[in-house]
Design a protein with these regions (language model features):
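Conserved mid-domain beta->alpha element of the FAD-binding
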Residues: 5-25, 29-32, 154-155, 181, ...
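Short, solvent-exposed loop/turn segments at secondary-structure junctions
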Residues: 10-11, 22, 33-34, 52, ...
Length: 454
């Protein structure tokens, strides 16, 4: 059996590791020309679902490297006003378990971790154009005139998936009406003092009038500005980082990143055309009454890291007839960052698909029925996450409406302040948040064994 994976993102690369360990022939085709291409330097939160999936799919030492290269753990989940007054702060549970825990990692770091050990499997500079299906094989064609043939083609090519457009033209994505401006700045003596201690040690959401919001993450890593392991980092972590070849491709250093979001009609009409300094100026223009420290964060941002994001979401569709083409991650269930589970859902897909393909390898199932079982489960939890994420991030939310928006914001703030003074309610809220992020789910264990010898 040969598997063709279109797209070298989180889900596709994780799947490739699992298949490789299972002795299944797999190739990944990535359109970027180099492993360092693309703007991958922002945070991704890996929840217990994602951690279990990576633990199941990656070789043991590579998973340990993933844990060693994550950012410092967040201690708090904070909700604040635009003048940095606390509305709600949840103390997150500390966990020393390398699997059953939340992790923050730079997207570039995660990319380099997942590319480790896949030399000869990932082909760069491969822009997918189309596929052809036949009874016993499928062929992918690329813009450079080459092609590849296998038994199964997996679309892991993101929200703009060309595979999906050809295979499931009825599967659409739509705008949420929300646009974000993203940027990051290095942690310095000045920038570190601009945020309160809980913000520096946590994940923070700012709820402001007119539906404006801003997320702030502080990311500190185990290596310094020169890429050397920091003093005081010893033991296995130090050894793993020193041995990891991916660090030479990783430009990640300690940073603060932020994402300012609002309904599209609250931002300049040409927001998606702006870049760099123009986006920083826009962020400052639309936040005149915000705390000076937040505005200073915007001013200190590296213009080269700033870009606009038009938030899209999938429209759930009915099940389709399964075949030798399937999909995972954003290619089928693009979701807003409202719940922070997009990458984790892609990893969940990768484990479940890998499990089914191992069954095919072992003769327990035929290929198409195995794909069907994977898709039936994936559609259920994937589109559920899409809908719940969209509910958290849409211009249809009352907070974006004139008049009623003020009342909605006032009600939201009152509710958060009330909960903030009720420790049992805070614990329930924290536990509910963690349950949604997979804290109590056990389906993502997978014991990958090599193919039995004939």
């Amino acid at each position: 059996m040969r598997v063709l994976v279109i797209g070298g993102g989180t889900g596709g690369l994780a799947l490739a590791h699992g298949l490789r360990r299972a002795g299944i022939d797999v190739s990944v085709y990535e359109r970027d020309a180099l492993r360092t291409d693309g703007l991958h330097g922002y945070r991704v939160g890996i929840d217990p679902d994602g951690s279990r999936a990576l633990h199941a799919l990656l070789p043991t030492e590579l998973y340990d490297t993933f844990v060693a290269t994550k950012a410092r753990d967040s201690k708090y989940f904070n909700m604040l006003t635009e003048d940095l007054k606390e509305l709600l702060s949840l103390e997150l549970l500390e966990s020393t378990d390398p699997v059953e825990s939340e992790k923050s990692i730079s997207r570039m770091t995660l990319r380099q971790v997942l590319l480790t050990g896949l030399d000869g499997i990932v082909e760069f500079g491969k822009e997918f154009t189309r596929f052809e299906q036949h009874a016993d094989h499928v062929t992918a064609y690329f813009a450079d005139g080459t092609s590849a043939t296998g038994d199964l083609l997996v679309a892991a090519d993101g929200s703009g998936s060309r595979v999906r457009r050809q295979y499931l033209p009825q599967a659409k994505t739509e705008e949420t009406g929300i646009v974000a401006i993203a940027g990051k700045l290095p942690i310095t003596a000045e920038s570190a003092k601009l945020v309160p201690p809980k913000v520096f040690e946590g994940i923070s959401l700012i709820n402001a009038p007119r539906g404006f919001g801003c997320i702030v993450h502080v990311m500190e890593f185990q290596w310094d500005h020169d890429g050397n392991v920091k003093d005081g980092i010893g033991g296995n972590t130090e050894e793993l980082i020193r041995r990891w070849p991916g660090l030479q491709f990783d430009n990640t250093r300690d940073y603060i990143n932020w994402g300012l979001s609002a309904a599209k009609d609250k931002l300049p009409a040409n927001i998606m055309e702006l870049r760099g300094a123009d986006l920083i100026k826009t962020a400052l223009d639309v936040t005149p009454g915000w705390h000076p420290n937040l505005r200073r964060l915007f001013e200190l941002t590296d213009p080269g890291t700033c870009f606009p994001v038009n938030i899209w979401t999938s429209v759930p569709i009915d099940p389709w007839e399964s075949s030798n083409v399937t999909l995972l991650g954003d290619a089928i269930h693009t979701m807003t960052p409202g719940r922070g589970v997009g990458a984790n859902t892609a990893l969940r897909d990768a484990v479940n698909l890998c499990r089914k393909l191992i069954d095919v390898r072992d003769g327990k199932q035929e290929l198409v029925p195995a794909v069907h079982e994977y898709e039936a489960r994936m559609i259920e939890y994937g589109f559920d996450a899409v809908l719940k994420s969209r509910a958290q991030m849409t211009s249809a939310d009352p907070v974006h409406k004139p008049g009623i928006g003020r009342l909605a914001l006032a009600g939201l703030r009152t509710a958060m302040r009330t909960v903030n003074h009720l420790p049992p309610a805070k614990r329930r809220m924290r536990d509910q948040m963690m349950t949604f992020r997979g804290a109590d789910r056990d389906e993502l264990t997978l014991d990958i064994t090599p193919a039995p010898q004939p």
